Amino acid sequence: MQNRRDQHPYNVAYYAAHREEEIQRVRIRQAATLDFLRDLRRQPCQDCSGTFPPWVMDFDHRDPHEKKFSLSAGKVLLKPRAALLEEIAKCDIVCANCHAVRSYEWVKANKATLTWFAVGVSSRIEEKRAYWKANVDLLAKLRDVPCLDSGRRFPFYVLQFDHRDPTQKRYTVSQMISHAGPETILAEVAKCDIVCANCHRDRTFRRRPASAGVL
C-alpha cells in the first residue's frame, strides 16, 4: 500500500491534469455552502424581530467559549456540512445591529475593561491607558449621531465608520485607538459616513462581487 508521501506525486500530477475541473468543483461546492448559509439566515432577528437580507444577519454564538470557528469567514465555505450544522446549533441568528449590542453587553458583563485589554508592565502603562481612553471617548462622541442611511438613532457601539471611497482608506477607524492621535483619527473619520451596523453591512455587500465572502 502506498503511504502518504508516495501518494503526493500522484496527487500533484492529477491536479495539474485536471486543474480547471478541480477549480470548478470547488467553486460549485462553495456556492452551494454560501446558499445554504444564506437560506438559514432568511428569518427574523431573534432579538428585534426585524426582517433583513441574509447578509445583514449573523450567527451569534450563545457561549463564546464553545465557538470552534467563525461562520462568516471565507474559509468556512469548504467546511463539511456536518461541521457547519454542529457550529450553527450553538448560535442565535440576529441582525448586525443586535449582534453589536450583544457583543458590547458581553464585554460589560465580563468586566472586559480597558485595564483588561491594556495589560502591561510598562512604567507608562497608566499614561497609555489614559491616551487610549481619550480616543475611545472621542470615537463614541463622533458616533452620537443618527445613522446616515436609515435616519435612526442607536447606541454609539452600533454605529460604524464606512469609508465613502475604499481606495482612500488608510486605517480601520475602530482600530486606531492605540496607535493614532486625535488629528490622525479625525482625518480618517472625515473620509467616512457614520452608519449603523445593518446599513454598513448592506453597503459592503453591494460593493462586493457576488462571489466575495460568506456575506
Language model feature labels by segment:
Residues 74, 110-112, 176, 213:
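Residues in and immediately flanking transmembrane alpha helices
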Residues 32-64, 89-98, 134-166, 190-199:
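Short cysteine-rich loop/turn motifs with clustered Cys
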Residues 68-98, 170-199:
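Short beta-strand-alpha-helix junction that forms the catalytic/metal-binding core
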Residues 29-37, 78-86, 131-140, 179-187:
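Short, intrinsically disordered, charge-biased short linear motifs at domain edges
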Residues 1-27, 54-58, 63-70, 97-131, ...:
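BZIP DNA-binding basic region
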Residues 1, 212-215:
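Short intrinsically disordered terminal tails
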Residues 91-111, 192-211:
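Short Cys/His-centered divalent metal-binding micro-motifs
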